[in-house]
Amino acid sequence: MSAKVKRLTLTIALAALAVGGVRTIYPSSSQIITARPLALNTDNPAQKQVGMLEFVAAWELRSRNENFGGVSALIALADNRFVAISDAGTVIHFRVTDDGRIDRATIAPLPNLHGPNVSYKDRDSEGLAYDPDSGQYWVSFEGKHAIRRYSKSFAQQTGLVRPIVMQDLPRNKGAETIFRLQDGRFIIIAESLDDDIHSAWMFSGDPIESTTTKTPFQFRPPPGYRVTDAVPLPDGRIAILNRAVRFPSGFTAKVSLLSPESIKGIRHESVISAEVIAALSSPLRVDNMEGIAVTNQGNKLFLWLISDNNFTVLQRTILMKFRLPDQPHSKKPEASTAPGL
């Protein structure tokens, strides 16, 4: 088989997996996660710059736990600790040490999502929001469109709502992204596209509470891409992760920044967009990128990206760390397109 045919065959397989591949089960309850360092570009190991982002490190994460994988969202806590959720209703806690090891790992099911009367549609968790003051989490689900609230450390479910505005969304194309702004408002972005635009909603407060008002608006991603996750930055900007599957290049990802002014300008049915600051495509390290989080070290900001392996042997759970520039530039260049797989 020629190299070109091999690349095309792999790309077709990856495209199928992106929509939900065949799960590979390893019966184990291990709580150990290992990390193997990866280069950004094996063809050019010295490369560090990707658009406006500076590459710091990348790892392939592995665990023998049967519920590890399928990561769909990522939140950063203090001390390089992270919380991830999978689209199988699992919550994953871990810490990245200074020397690139994983410790303090736990892999456990979300409360209230397992049992004889619960189907996969109930467990299809996609988005994750966090309130650092109360320690509460909010998880969005796209199989049966819902938002669930959890107490500190996911000890118990404390609320459930199925917003009427989301019930007409296509199956498995619901609330892909949820994040909480510093002032307590929430934004939810649906995975589905209509004329290349995402449906989205601004919630005036906790989405679980009946008194919270909703402002529908639309978000336009980069052409050919879909939003998979987003995270507020300390300065009020929003970092957005966008993903695409293309032939023959396979998975690609773009990181964009939404300005505070754009958020302030959200009105009923308004259309907003963000500026692309970096693009990942082959030969750069990239997979089915689904989660994004932010950490800081003094004045330095770091973006962390994580991929969804769809519980298959053909994909990997990749964690990547990039540094944001100290000051936003007036012009944010996009990384040049790289050759395909």
Segments from the language model and where they lie:
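Sequence/structural signature of beta-propeller domains
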Residues: 2-341
